[in-house]
């Protein structure tokens, strides 16, 4: 369906049997032999005892290696090297046992290969290389397992998103790289990804709110069984209580504010008054340039429009070949993979596409969230403002209640006049890095709408800040290849 700006917008309000297009290669996953767990300790006491026993055994072995007179012909350096090698391997194993990490057949095979390679290298190549590989066998044995996405869960996830209201991040639970943990009844779910032993939760749970507390408890138990530590990114203020009890979560998580949603109250939004003057001027400029807009469902794109929009992607400063983002982005642009996706397209006076915005829907059509805006280099000024304003107008006609434009990261750094020294340093760094991360430019755009909403938080353990920084930065900024 195609709708010109100002015509009713179809948000699939009364169409629960929406088409979900899945990649053709997706099949129901089977448990592979290499993923079979061969050692699993699910008792914390047993983990502590096992780790302590391994450390004691290592100390005893090191004492034998270092002091046994029958090996007096060994050089001191050789005894020390073997002692450190054994200690390193045992330390890796003890840490993995303490964290409750299971050992799969693949882990055992990899550890055996490391050990054999280390012994061979020690005899044939170099002592140091052999010792590193032998120590690495303990590291390979206890390497954390990972969760793998199940594309066939998309219809279930979409049904829960369609039942979730007033959560601007709910549609992004569909992102292809995310795994999902469902409640026992399947009426609620969490989206998450795993990375180097951390389970990073994306946003709030979706679905039946009454199931959220038990869902979080079940998810925490599942994480402990796999030896994963929990991190939550994009948690809303009203859901902080779900993660506040260390007895339930199994660890203490500290909330750190990272920004605020920008949500338009659609029914009451009017571009009138002095404070909207800059927005009105930007929109008016596009009218003067002869810019027009149209709205189309992504799954209903014809070949001509898809080719035109793909050309805009290729000409966009954001890049055409990669996706980025974790908590507040989808992927698969123009693929028609996800249900409920609407595109609003801007054309200049000659009919050439200059830009488009991608919106995801939730709550049976009550909520819309902007995914990613795309525009050509050199597109007329005000294109983004015009696309946002026209989508708000169309959403109002369609009965949409809330429209999320984006997420304003650290708005207090940009909006406050009085800043401390650390805040000034942070703002200066953000200003310098703006060509890469565009936080300051995004804030300048969003403040024209005067629609800052509730805060979002990242929930982390303060004892693991540096490792978590690496994990979160890799999830947000490491590019993923896009297929068009």
Swiss-Prot record:
Pfam families the record matches: LPG_synthase_C (PF09924)
Similarity comment text for this entry: Belongs to the LPG synthetase family.
Subcellular location: Cell inner membrane
Signal peptide: none
Name used for this protein in its record: MprF-like domain protein Rv1619
InterPro entries for this protein: LPG_synthase_C, PG_lysyltransferase
Note: Expression in M.smegmatis increases cell resistance to human beta-defensin 2 (hBD-2) and to sodium nitrite. It also reduces the negative charge on the bacterial surface upon exposure to an acidic environment, enhances bacterial cell viability at lethal acidic pH and induces a slowdown in biofilm formation.
GO cellular component: plasma membrane
Keywords: Cell inner membrane, Cell membrane, Membrane, Transmembrane, Transmembrane helix
Membrane topology, as annotated: Multi-pass membrane protein
Domain of life: Bacteria
Transmembrane segments: 48-68, 80-100, 114-134, 458-478
PANTHER family the UniProt entry points to: PHOSPHATIDYLGLYCEROL LYSYLTRANSFERASE (PTHR34697:SF2)
């Amino acid at each position: 369906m195609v709708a010109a700006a100002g015509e009713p917008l179809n948000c699939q309000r009364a169409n629960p049997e929406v088409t979900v297009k899945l990649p053709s290669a997706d099949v129901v996953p089977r448990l592979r032999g290499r993923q079979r767990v061969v050692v699993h300790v699910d008792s914390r006491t047993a983990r502590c005892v096992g780790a302590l026993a391994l450390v004691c055994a290592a100390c005893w072995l090191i004492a034998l290696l270092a002091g046994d007179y029958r090996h007096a012909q060994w050089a001191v350096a050789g005894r020390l090297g073997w002692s450190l090698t054994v200690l390193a391997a045992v330390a890796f194993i003890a840490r993995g046992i303490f964290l409750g990490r299971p050992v799969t057949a693949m882990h055992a095979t990899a550890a055996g290969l490391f050990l054999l390679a280390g012994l061979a290298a020690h005899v044939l190549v170099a002592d140091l290389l052999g010792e590193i590989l032998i120590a690495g066998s303990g590291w390979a044995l206890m390497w954390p397992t990972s969760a793998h996405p199940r594309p066939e869960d998309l219809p279930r996830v979409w049904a829960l998103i369609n039942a979730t209201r007033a959560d601007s991040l709910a549609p992004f639970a569909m992102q292809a790289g995310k795994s999902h943990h469902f409640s026992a009844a399947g009426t609620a779910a969490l989206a998450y990804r795993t990375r180097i032993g951390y389970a990073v939760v994306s946003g709030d749970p979706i679905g039946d709110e009454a199931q959220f507390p038990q869902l979080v408890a079940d998810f925490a138990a599942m994480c402990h069984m796999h030896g994963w530590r929990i991190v939550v990114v994009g948690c809303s203020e009203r859901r902080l209580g779900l993660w506040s009890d260390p007895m339930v979560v199994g660890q203490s998580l500290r909330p750190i504010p990272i920004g605020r949603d920008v949500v338009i109250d659609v029914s009451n939004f009017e571009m009138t008054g002095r404070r909207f003057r800059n927005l009105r001027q930007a929109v008016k400029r596009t009218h003067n340039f002869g810019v027009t807009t149209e709205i189309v469902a992504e799954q209903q794109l014809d070949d001509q429009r898809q080719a035109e929009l793909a050309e805009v992607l290729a000409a966009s400063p954001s890049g055409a070949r990669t996706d980025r983002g974790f908590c507040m982005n989808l992927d698969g642009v123009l693929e028609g993979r996800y249900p409920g996706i609407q595109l609003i397209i801007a054309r200049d006076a000659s009919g050439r596409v200059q830009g488009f915005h991608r919106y995801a829907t939730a709550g049976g059509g009550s909520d819309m969230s902007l995914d990613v805006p795309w525009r050509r280099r050199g597109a007329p000024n005000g294109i983004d403002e015009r696309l946002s304003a026209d989508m708000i107008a169309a959403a109002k006609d369609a009965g949409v209640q809330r429209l999320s434009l984006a997420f304003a990261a650290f708005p207090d750094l940009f909006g406050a006049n009085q800043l401390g020294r650390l805040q000034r340093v942070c703002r200066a760094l953000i200003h310098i890095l703006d060509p890469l991360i565009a936080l300051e430019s995004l804030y300048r755009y969003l403040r024209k709408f005067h629609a800052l909403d509730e805060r979002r938080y990242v929930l982390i353990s303060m004892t693991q800040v540096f490792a978590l920084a690496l994990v979160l930065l890799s999830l947000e900024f490491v590019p993923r290849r896009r297929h068009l």
